[in-house]
Amino acid sequence: TGVDSSRGMLDIFDRKIMEHTLKNVKTLHLDVEAGAALPGPYHLVVSSMTLHHIRDTAVLFHHFHEALLPSGLVCIADLDSENGLFHSDPTGTFHNGFDRAEFQRVLENAGFSHVTASTAAEIIKPVDRLGDHRFTVFLITGRKDVSK
């Protein structure tokens, strides 16, 4: 299930589902920030390059934890802290990346264990008149304990 509060993003995802003839993937328009609960239960929650567009990530991580089955995994890829250059138009961007150590603590506070972080990728992109700039993307994973 692909969940987003943006109908436009879900339309793009729906097109990709059709292009690849995926039969076991669906989309769901849901605004978790407005208090809507994720359906679930899920074995895995994945977020890729979206959390810097979420105001309160701590609340979202609690939603992720609640939606997971015991032993379920959360995998999050997003920007490391940066100086605001990644988005040329910052509309809808609430974080200029994240400090990994702080992000790990927020996941642990939401109830996740075995939280680890690593560098997943580097993005080189042109930044206005500054030329190419390097941005790193982290991957943080955590597990919902069996007892929870």
Model-derived features with residue positions:
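Class I SAM-dependent methyltransferase SAM/SAH-binding core
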Residues: 1-35
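A short glycine-rich, Lys/Arg-flanked "PGG" loop and its adjoining helix->strand segment in the class I
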Residues: 58-73
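Short catalytic micro-motifs in class I SAM-dependent methyltransferases
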Residues: 49-50
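A conserved beta-strand element that flanks and buttresses the S-adenosyl-L-methionine
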Residues: 46
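C-terminal lobe and adjacent flexible extensions of AdoMet/dcAdoMet transferase-like proteins
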Residues: 140-148
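Glycine-rich phosphate-binding loop signature in dinucleotide/nucleotide-binding domains
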Residues: 37-40
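Conserved acidic residues
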Residues: 43
